[in-house]
Swiss-Prot record:
Keywords: 2Fe-2S, Chloroplast, Electron transport, Iron, Iron-sulfur, Metal-binding, Plastid, Transit peptide, Transport
Annotated GO CC locations: chloroplast; chloroplast stroma; etioplast stroma
Protein function: Ferredoxins are iron-sulfur proteins that transfer electrons in a wide variety of metabolic reactions.
Lineage, broadest ranks: Eukaryota, Viridiplantae, Streptophyta, Embryophyta, Tracheophyta
GO molecular function: 2 iron, 2 sulfur cluster binding; electron transfer activity; metal ion binding
Subcellular location, record wording: Plastid, Chloroplast
InterPro entries: 2Fe-2S_ferredoxin-like_sf (IPR036010), 2Fe-2S_ferredoxin-type (IPR001041), 2Fe2S_fd_BS (IPR006058), Beta-grasp_dom_sf (IPR012675), Fd_pln (IPR010241)
Protein name per UniProt: Ferredoxin-3, chloroplastic
Residues engaged in binding [2Fe-2S] cluster: 95, 100, 103, 133
CC cofactor note: Binds 1 [2Fe-2S] cluster.
Domain called 2Fe-2S ferredoxin-type: residue spans: 58-149
Provenance organism: Zea mays
Transit pept. (range): 1-55
GO biological process: electron transport chain
Family (UniProt): Belongs to the 2Fe2S plant-type ferredoxin family.
């Protein structure tokens, strides 16, 4: 048995897909029979299959330089910049690889995983700076955007 623990504000989205052979009714003069319509392939078995996948979704609030706020849902497997664009929020960016500081922000609350980035040093990350192009949300978070100038 396995156990998973999630943050209390975490939302799980799931996809369930089932596949099974379809059946067709064929009427013969003496009986009504059901036959499975399955392509016959040597050495392959047909069976019901259940695929399940789940992902966590967090609330991300971005606060712009003029105090404007944008809140949207961001899955834990998408960069914050990409999730913002999907939600219709425009943010500055250049490299999309974590190698520059154009998309820099400063996290006020919450946590992110930005292990894909290489531009920010440990001290800047400890001060709360994030690169939205390579940051995955790991909890609900509030990030102040347009912070490239603060890094220098």
């Amino acid at each position: 048995m396995s156990t998973s623990t999630f943050a209390t504000s975490c939302t799980l989205l799931g996809n369930v897909r089932t596949t099974q052979a379809s059946q067709t009714a064929v009427k013969s003069p003496s009986s009504l029979s059901f036959f499975s319509q399955v392509t016959k392939v040597p050495s392959l078995k047909t069976s019901k299959k259940l695929d399940v996948s789940a992902m966590a979704v967090y609330k991300v609030k971005l606060v712009g330089p003029e105090g404007e706020e944008h809140e949207f849902d961001a899955p834990d497997d998408a960069y914050i910049l990409d999730a913002a664009e999907t939600a219709g929020v425009e943010l500055p960016y250049s490299c999309r690889a974590g190698a520059c500081s154009t998309c820099a922000g400063k996290i006020e609350s919450g946590s992110v995983d930005q292990s894909d980035g290489s531009f920010l040093d440990d001290g800047q990350q400890e001060e709360g700076y994030v690169l939205t192009c390579v940051s995955y949300p790991k909890s609900d978070c509030v990030i102040h955007t347009h912070k490239e100038g603060d890094l220098y």
